[in-house]
Curated annotation (Swiss-Prot):
Protein name, entry field: Glutamate 5-kinase
Organism encoding this protein: Salmonella arizonae (strain ATCC BAA-731 / CDC346-86 / RSK2980)
InterPro entries: AceGlu_kinase-like_sf, Asp/Glu/Uridylate_kinase, G5K_ProB, Glu/AcGlu_kinase, Glu_5kinase, Glu_5kinase/COase_Synthase, Glutamate_5-kinase_CS, PUA
Reaction(s) catalysed (UniProt annotation): L-glutamate + ATP = L-glutamyl 5-phosphate + ADP
Keyword hit for Kinase: yes
Alphabetical list of Gene3D superfamilies matching this protein: Acetylglutamate kinase-like, PUA domain
Gene transcribed to yield this protein: proB
MF terms (GO), sorted A to Z: ATP binding; glutamate 5-kinase activity; RNA binding
SMART domains: PUA
All residue ranges annotated as the PUA domain in the record: 275-353
């Protein structure tokens, strides 16, 4: 083995269940064995696990419940304890302790909470404890959810300062087309940047048991790679897949990390789930993308959502394309009032000002 590395392994519901209605315990045993082997070799392992809802449904005998958020939260509340108990039992075979971390979007949006979560995660790793991370589905609503465990795993990789992020799924990797419907589809082995062509290939394929598809894995890979973290999408059923990834063997689709990764603050900006969205005109779009300029109120066309000053927001062009994320200097109500106006008018409109820009270029990451 090479020098010690930190690996985040994301296990989707389809991997943990094998596509069935219940957890595939035999397969989970094998995944734990692979992780334990790496742990014994001195590597640091973080697991982002799906499956709480599936575990809850299995434990309750597959009840017929309405398809509502409340039903999912009920199943998650039951399943989270069952799932963590399973991880604890299996890792204890190898004398490895685990620590559970349940996160929501609020833990990522607020810079102080982000740093607290980072410190907690790294403390677990420093003490040779394997963190088991999941979104807190039992309490999270649409407004506070990260949305899927693919993006959560990218955030976990940033928090952990990971070297690699492994997204295990029921597919071999990213293909040129959907291999389930197109026999001519070819595996894409290496990716050096996520673009619109790749996003189009990924489409909206979603497993019936989980909340993530290939498109969310692409989002996660983009976030992680821009933070300097190699990301691999591979099949969870491939024998020895976790060890192969740590050895650097060719497996699945590898997204190569950017040579010049983002600084820590900008990693947070890029990774934090946006609290709201603003649409900007063509002039502002060109200024941001071509000249690296700050966003002035004059260029804002509309504001969506309710957010506070200091929260991360999404900046979109008039075609709806996500062009940047940044920290807003004003709250959503204030931005609605000053949108389309010159910076010199801010004080007259609001009765105060926090400077002439809506989002400063130092607090902005282009997509």
């Amino acid at each position: 083995m090479s020098d010690s590395q930190t690996l985040v392994v994301k296990l989707g519901t389809s991997v943990l269940t094998g596509g069935s209605r219940r957890l595939n315990r035999a397969h989970i045993v094998e995944l734990v064995r692979q992780c334990a082997q790496l742990h014994a070799a001195g590597h640091r392992i973080v697991i982002v696990t799906s499956g709480a809802i599936a575990a809850g449904r299995e434990h309750l005998g597959y009840p017929e419940l309405p398809v509502t958020i409340a039903s999912k939260q009920l199943l998650a509340a039951v399943g989270q304890s069952r799932l963590i108990q399973l991880w604890e039992q299996l890792f204890s075979i190898y004398g490895i302790h685990i620590g559970q971390m349940l996160l929501t979007r609020a833990d990522m949006e607020d810079r102080e909470r982000f740093l607290n979560a980072r410190d907690m995660l790294r403390a677990l790793l420093d003490n040779h404890i394997v963190p088991i991370i999941n979104e807190n589905d039992a309490v999270a609503t649409v407004e506070i959810k990260v949305g899927d465990n693919d993006n959560l795993s990218a955030l976990a990789a940033i928090l952990a300062g990971a070297d690699k992020l492994l997204l295990l799924t029921d597919q071999q990797g990213l293909f040129t087309a959907d291999p389930r419907s197109n026999p001519q589809a070819e595996l894409i082995k290496d990716v050096y940047g996520v673009d619109d062509a790749l996003r189009s290939i990924a489409g909206d394929s979603v497993s019936g048991l989980g909340t993530g598809g290939m498109s969310t894995k692409l989002q996660a890979a983009d976030v992680a790679c821009r933070a300097g973290i190699d990301t691999i999408i591979a099949s969870g059923s491939k024998p020895g897949v976790i060890g192969d990834v740590m050895e650097g063997n060719s497996v699945g689709t590898r997204f190569h990390a950017q040579a010049s990764p983002l600084e820590n603050r900008k990693r947070w900006i890029f990774g934090a789930p946006p609290a709201g969205e603003i649409t900007v005109d063509e002039g502002a779009t060109a200024a941001i993308l071509e000249r690296g300029s700050s966003l002035l109120p004059k260029g804002i066309k509309s504001v969506t959502g309710n957010f506070s000053r200091g929260e991360v927001i999404r900046i979109c062009n008039q075609q709806g394309r996500d062009i940047a994320h940044g920290v807003s200097r004003y709250n959503s109500d204030a931005l609605r009032r000053i949108a389309g106006h010159h910076s010199q008018q801010i004080d007259a409109i609001l009765g105060y000002e926090y400077g002439p820009v809506a989002v400063h270029r130092d607090d902005m990451i282009t997509r």
